[in-house]
């Protein structure tokens, strides 16, 4: 009796609105890696699901070329996370797979598999040598070499053994999330990082895994300096600045279920966590969490909360000044608020228009800023916007001869820090905030909160002082968004042109039960060479 063929849908790292079906040589499980052909090209794909009754006739279904037992399986939690990203951010599963397993990562896995094959061949040869007759000294040497090979092989295949020994796709209990009533906890204030430590200690003491996200590598560096003294070798870094080998080793460690504290940028969300207990999102308000190109164009904060839900993990968010999205969730009691007592330094706002009217400007410097610098001691950091650095440095040297005056951009400040500056002065704050963005006032409040982390005395020169004065509270801004139907009270979906990113249409969708259907309708009407961007920030 002929064997009944088995069919599976295989996810490929290409943009397809459908998942191809292939004939499998044997029963395969979701997450297994396979080699298939599509359009005369070979791909390493992932088994998405079994298919009992394929839509195509059997003679039109291609066979799987090989099962990649040498590559690690994709976990059930990873597959669920990919499905969330594709569904929420209106992209294809193939685009998510390509982001989660980019070419460099796949090559690194292949390299590891090749090395493992060579090591196993060397081990077999060493065992053959040991089976012969030798004197005691030769036997000791061969035995030591064999044991070294065994240890090296164990380092490459421990994750696969862990995958096979556990129950694939076993759902996590929600004990960590349930302890907080299932709600993410928000820590606000300049010292919010200190509030993360007890939760990290507790998770690691239980032998579990922790993810700490930062918006940029610059924040990773400062967070590493904060965490490394206490958590030492348990701390694993994961971002684009790490080598493929370093990133693969981190992935293997997590896949094996070993306790670890991972510190990374949004790409760390795609790691194969096996026992994730805690997700921390630092500086949750930072727009750098939003992926713009390529798809999936996801927001790291929101994706991290979804990932935590899949794993049943606890969530902590930290910010000096929160995003309005987080504030809305606090006010609607979806999130729990735990303020941190230490306030950020309050900025002194200087009205450039008023200074200009009373001849209070000397080049790019207001009289108030000049007086503040002259009355202070210690280094001064000037945060430039439109100003040319050479011209600004020349002005500073003329006005403050002999003073330690440094000039940086906002990006450099985040990356390098303020170098112990006593004063941090923003030369033209309006250059750092888009005037045409409905989020401008929110961004201004968040900018001041971020600057307060770097220096004790902040001065801000601006042509729009009301924006930076702090007179309008975040609750006022949230009420205004509600009145005019802007996010976060609605969902913004933009239709953009592929390549240029030009905005063709803007859709403000209500946050109700019709949201999913409205998003699906936009996808169905998508024209060639266009794409949809959900929750854009620029």
Model-found features: residue ranges?
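Accessory, non-ATPase domains that flank or precede helicase/AAA+ motor cores in DNA-metabolism machines
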Residues: 1-160, 173, 180-348, 352-363, ...
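A conserved SF2-helicase RecA2
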Residues: 327-333, 459-485
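Short, hydrophobic beta-strand segments
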Residues: 351-353, 491-496, 504-510
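Glycine-rich, charged/polar anion/phosphate-binding loops
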Residues: 264-266, 366-369, 408-413, 446, ...
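Serine residues within intrinsically disordered or low-complexity segments
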Residues: 159-167
């Amino acid at each position: 009796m002929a064997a009944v063929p088995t069919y599976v849908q295989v996810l490929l790292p290409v943009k397809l609105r459908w998942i191809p079906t292939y004939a499998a040589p044997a029963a395969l499980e979701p997450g297994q890696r396979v080699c298939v052909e599509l359009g005369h090209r070979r791909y390493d794909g992932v088994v998405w699901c079994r298919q009992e009754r394929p839509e195509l006739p059997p003679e039109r279904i291609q066979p799987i070329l090989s099962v990649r037992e040498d590559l690690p399986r994709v976990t059930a939690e990873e597959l669920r996370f990919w499905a969330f990203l594709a569904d929420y951010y209106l992209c294809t599963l193939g685009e998510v797979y390509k982001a989660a397993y980019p070419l460099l990562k796949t090559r690194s896995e292949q390299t590891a598999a090749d090395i493992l094959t060579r090591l196993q061949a060397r081990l077999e040869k060493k065992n053959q040598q040991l089976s012969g007759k030798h004197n005691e000294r030769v036997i000791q040497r061969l035995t030591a070499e064999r044991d070294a090979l065994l240890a090296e092989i164990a380092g490459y295949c421990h994750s696969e053994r862990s995958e096979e020994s556990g129950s694939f796709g076993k759902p996590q209990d929600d004990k960590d999330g349930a302890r907080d009533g299932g709600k993410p906890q928000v820590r606000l204030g300049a010292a919010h990082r200190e509030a993360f430590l007890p939760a990290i200690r507790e998770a690691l003491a239980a032998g579990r895994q922790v993810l700490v996200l930062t918006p940029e590598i610059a924040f990773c560096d400062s967070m590493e300096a904060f965490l490394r003294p206490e958590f030492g070798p348990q701390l694993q870094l994961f971002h684009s600045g790490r080598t493929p080998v370093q990133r693969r080793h981190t992935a293997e460690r997590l896949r094996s279920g070993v306790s670890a504290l991972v510190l990374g940028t949004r790409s760390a969300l795609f790691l194969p966590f096996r026992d994730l207990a805690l997700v921390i999102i630092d500086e949750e308000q930072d727009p750098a969490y939003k992926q713009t190109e390529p798809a999936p164009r996801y927001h790291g904060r929101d994706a991290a909360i979804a990932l935590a839900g899949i794993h049943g993990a606890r969530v902590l968010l930290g910010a000096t000044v929160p995003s309005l999205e987080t504030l809305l969730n606090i006010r609607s009691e979806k999130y729990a608020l735990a303020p941190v007592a230490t306030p950020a330094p309050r900025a002194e706002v200087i009205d450039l228009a008023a200074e200009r009217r009373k001849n209070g400007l000397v080049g790019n410097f207001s009289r108030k800023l000049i007086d503040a610098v002259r009355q202070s001691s210690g280094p001064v950091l000037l945060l430039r916007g439109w100003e040319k650095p050479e011209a600004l440095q020349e002005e500073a040297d003329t006005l403050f001869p002999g003073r330690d005056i440094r000039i940086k951009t906002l990006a450099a400040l985040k990356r390098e820090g303020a170098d112990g500056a006593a004063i941090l002065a923003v030369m033209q704050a309006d250059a750092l905030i888009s005037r045409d963005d409905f989020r401008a006032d929110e961004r201004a409040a968040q900018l001041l909160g971020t600057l307060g982390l770097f220096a004790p005395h902040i001065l801000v020169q601006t042509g729009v002082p009301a924006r930076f004065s702090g007179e309008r509270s975040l609750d006022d801004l949230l009420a205004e968004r509600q009145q005019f139907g802007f996010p976060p009270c609605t969902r913004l979906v933009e239709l953009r042109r592929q390549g240029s990113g030009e905005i063709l249409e803007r859709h403000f969708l209500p946050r109700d039960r019709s949201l999913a259907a409205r998003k699906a309708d936009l996808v169905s009407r998508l024209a060639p060479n266009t794409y949809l961007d959900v929750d854009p920030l620029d």
